[in-house]
């Protein structure tokens, strides 16, 4: 889509609006099928991370993107039951990625290994990066491999890093938060080592990470 838009747009900039993206599964048992209430797991967190990385990587064209939907419907960020509320893994990905908003997108490239399933193949690592107004750099990454960790060496061309912090959201593909256990899947600190031009870390299987590099 972005290639077509860039090829044919004239003097006026044409934006791409991505409406109602997200996962759509069978509804939870014993719920009204018309309400589209579904559980939200680490699998959905990976879907959110991939999509948000794509949107950031194509932010010169993507002008708006709306997840379907925010509360209790489809790939919801929040689930409620009476007076109770639980934050889903998808919510935590949005929170970890919020530094991309209003920042300057940086070109990024990842050397990856393909994951093969039936006749489909996808990269095991998905990344995006942006620079904040204060000069810090946010790198977001998703490990799509649900059985193997990925050692990561990030090189930031032209940067002079002075420190790095990182958080990771990880768990089994079906891991999720419930009203009885609302913090089963939450971001935790990720051990990261600073290098002369970036950092190194290891992404757990089925995980989403956000690295903030100060310089």
Kindly label every feature range from the protein language model.
Residues 121-160, 166, 209-212:
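Carbohydrate-binding surface patches
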Residues 3-7, 51-55, 82, 125-129, ...:
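Generic recognition of flexible, low-complexity loop/linker segments
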């Amino acid at each position: 889509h972005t290639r077509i838009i860039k090829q044919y747009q004239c003097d006026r900039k044409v934006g791409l609006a991505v409406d109602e993206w997200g996962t759509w599964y069978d509804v939870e048992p014993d719920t009204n099928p018309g309400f589209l209430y579904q559980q939200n797991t680490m699998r959905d967190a990976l879907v959110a991370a991939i999509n948000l990385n794509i949107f950031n990587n194509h932010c010169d064209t993507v002008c708006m993107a709306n997840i379907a939907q925010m509360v209790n419907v489809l790939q919801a960020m929040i689930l409620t039951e009476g007076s109770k509320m639980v934050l889903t893994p998808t919510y935590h990905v949005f929170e970890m990625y919020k530094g991309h908003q209003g920042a300057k997108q940086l070109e990024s490239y990842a050397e990856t290994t393909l994951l093969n399933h039936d006749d489909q193949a996808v990269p095991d690592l998905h990344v995006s990066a942006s620079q904040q107004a204060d000069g810090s750099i946010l790198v977001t990454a998703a490990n799509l491999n649900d059985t193997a960790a990925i050692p990561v060496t990030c090189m930031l061309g032209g940067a002079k890093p002075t420190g790095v912090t990182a958080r990771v959201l990880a768990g089994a593909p079906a891991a999720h938060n419930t009203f009885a256990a609302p913090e089963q899947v939450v971001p935790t600190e990720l051990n990261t080592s600073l290098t002369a031009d970036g950092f190194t870390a290891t992404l757990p299987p089925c995980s989403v990470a956000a690295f903030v590099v100060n310089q």
